[in-house]
């Protein structure tokens, strides 16, 4: 473009048009997984739904996928939101750094490790029995992302603590149990303590209806596929950007879980 052409052109309109086009492109790229069901609280701050956990799909062994990740904001203002390589049993730069902070013996370092600790999530297929906030979800199969508290209730149903309780596989179509998800807000956080399983019962009275549900389930292996994780070096680069390169602390000897676990890591 010559100077004369530049003078005649309406650069403002061009810039605005380009910016709008770019924003539209970015909006199209933003991804919302429509397969995921999410609970919603009512005006009182409570949530309620009845779900049925579903068994593993054909070709997979487990009815859940287990995923560790990190989500924290660094001093730069940037966020580090990444899946942790510890999910795959590999070394991860944030876990190594957190271990170094924890082992320093300095309380302020431990506080940093707590803020940066990895978080545990599970994914399972569910059938929505009842959802008063969104009745259009009832009778449909979704993926459900949940944490350790709900997983503990699943394990308690399979491994009851008392002699008068019968073990139940909540993922079984015929001998499983509906899960009454009850959410309250306690100290600003969602609390699931009131949630419980109903008495065991078949999902449906006929196998044809059960098979229709089974065919609609989603594979879970994708959540722990290697393609779902960045490499160690990529994560390290991102971590340095978020923390502005201010995080060299000692040698690494342990991994962080919900609380520190004294297990040796080879670096």
Model-derived segments and their meaning:
Residues 1-170, 229-233:
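OB-fold ssDNA-binding interfaces and closely related basic DNA-contact patches used
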Residues 130-266:
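Compact mixed alphabeta submodule
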């Amino acid at each position: 473009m010559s100077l004369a052409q530049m003078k005649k052109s309406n650069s403002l309109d061009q810039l605005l048009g380009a910016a709008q086009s770019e924003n539209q492109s970015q909006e199209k790229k933003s991804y919302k997984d429509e397969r995921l069901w999410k609970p919603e609280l009512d005006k009182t701050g409570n949530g309620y739904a009845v779900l049925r956990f579903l068994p593993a799909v054909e070709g997979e062994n487990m009815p859940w996928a287990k995923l560790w990740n990190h989500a924290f904001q660094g001093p730069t203002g940037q966020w580090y939101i990444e899946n942790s390589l510890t999910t795959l049993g590999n070394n991860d730069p944030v876990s190594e750094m957190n271990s170094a902070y924890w082992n320093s013996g300095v309380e302020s370092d431990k506080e940093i490790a707590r803020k940066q600790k990895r978080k545990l999530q599970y994914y399972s297929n569910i059938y929505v029995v009842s959802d008063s906030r969104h009745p259009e979800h009832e009778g449909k199969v979704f993926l459900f992302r949940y944490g350790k508290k709900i997983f503990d209730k699943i394990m308690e149903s399979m491994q009851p603590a008392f002699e008068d309780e019968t073990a139940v596989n909540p993922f079984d179509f015929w001998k499983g149990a509906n899960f009454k998800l009850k959410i309250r807000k306690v100290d600003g956080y969602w609390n699931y303590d009131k949630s419980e399983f109903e008495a065991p019962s078949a999902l449906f009275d006929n196998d044809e209806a059960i098979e229709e549900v089974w065919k609609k389930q989603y594979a879970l292996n994708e959540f722990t596929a290697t393609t779902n994780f960045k490499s160690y070096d990529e994560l390290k680069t991102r971590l340095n950007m978020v923390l502005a390169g201010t995080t060299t602390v000692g040698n690494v000897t342990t991994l962080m879980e919900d609380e520190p676990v004294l297990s040796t890591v080879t670096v």
